[in-house]
């Protein structure tokens, strides 16, 4: 649940920033491109956070999430950055486009062999550097309070 809430902070911010920041290449049918789409992306990204937890359980010894661990955070960070790059590779320029703006510059140019000429911008990448840290700190606080 907390992953969905963390994610909704940027999904709905992106929505409020409008087409100047990002726009859909493909519109959802039946007028579902606004809030419903952002809500579904928030739920999906909550699942991505949970997959990061699963990776920790798969590759690290127990006990987990009882105190700060660079290995736990490292796995969550690596997963967050990897999946963001993969999602951008698959969908950026095909489903959505983030505009190159002074405060959201292109930091990775279009990849050779890619089906799109759109580069990767700063804000979506930065989100997935910061968000796993917030999620991880929440997990530690949750474990401490139980």
Give the residues covered by each predicted segment.
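Aromatic-rich, lipid-facing transmembrane alpha helices and their immediate juxtamembrane interface loops
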Residues: 1-146
């Amino acid at each position: 649940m907390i992953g969905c809430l963390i994610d909704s902070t940027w999904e709905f911010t992106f929505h409020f920033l409008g087409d100047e920041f990002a726009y859909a290449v493909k519109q959802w049918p039946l007028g579902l491109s606004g809030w419903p789409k952002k809500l579904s992306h928030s739920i999906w990204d909550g699942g991505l956070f949970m997959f990061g937890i699963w990776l920790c359980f798969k590759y690290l010894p127990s006990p987990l999430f009882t105190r700060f661990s660079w290995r736990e955070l490292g796995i969550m960070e690596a997963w967050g950055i990897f999946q963001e790059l993969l999602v951008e590779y698959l969908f950026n320029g095909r489903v959505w486009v983030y505009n190159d703006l002074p405060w959201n510059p292109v930091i990775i140019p279009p990849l050779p062999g890619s089906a799109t000429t759109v580069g990767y911008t700063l804000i979506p990448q930065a989100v997935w550097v910061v968000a796993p840290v917030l999620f991880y700190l929440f997990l530690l606080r949750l474990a401490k309070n139980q």
